[in-house]
Amino acid sequence: MNILNLFNAMPGNIAQGIIWGIMALGVFMTYKILDFADLSVDGSFATGGAVTVILMLSGMNSGTALVVAFICGVVAGVVTGILHTTLGIPGILASILVQIALYSINLSIMEGKANTALPVDKYNLLISLRYIPKSILVSAIFAAALIALMYVYFGTAQGSAIRATGNNPAMSRAQAG
């Protein structure tokens, strides 16, 4: 193994790591605030990517494709919540079930292919590993903005109430009433 190849791969790894760090924020939020380790975030993150790529390849503009992908992620989260609250499945198990199901759903969305690429020359992409320095900068700015937004939100009265409530049913009823 050539050590130079390792160093040449670092910028691409950093760019992807920042993007996956955004997904880790979702897991962190649900676990730290709600005491609910929602691992379905991992599967819904990939589902959003699959939906976006397939819709863009079929001719939909990127903004609309992202909105549809966001809705698909919300549906995945709702399914996790229904499994947990309505069917009484423990949260960690419900999220793992949804995560595993989403891997099969992702394969179905992408017509049986493990991955599908968007041609960078044909689409105007905000982040692409072809332009790694730009990808690192854009991803870092987006991650920093998201962290700042979460910090500000959880400092508000509503955010503080969510942090205080957590997974405490008595506090939830007190907040609602």
Question: Residue ranges of each PLM-predicted region?
Answer:
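Short, non-helical or kinked segments that cap or interrupt transmembrane helices
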Residues: T30-G48, L83-L97, A161
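Short, hydrophobic transmembrane alpha-helix segments
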Residues: N8, F28-A37, L57-M60
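Membrane-interfacial amphipathic/re-entrant helices at transmembrane-helix boundaries
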Residues: M1-M23, V51, G59-T64
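Membrane-interface helix caps of multi-pass small-molecule transporters
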Residues: M29, I54, S58, V78, ...
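Transmembrane helix-bundle core of multi-pass membrane transporters
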Residues: G91, S95-T156
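Alpha-helical transmembrane segments within multi-pass membrane transporters and channels
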Residues: M60-I100, I141-A144
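Interfacial loop-to-helix junctions that mark the boundaries of transmembrane helices
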Residues: L4-I14, G63, G88, L126-S139
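Membrane-helix/interface signature in polytopic inner-membrane proteins
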Residues: A148-G177
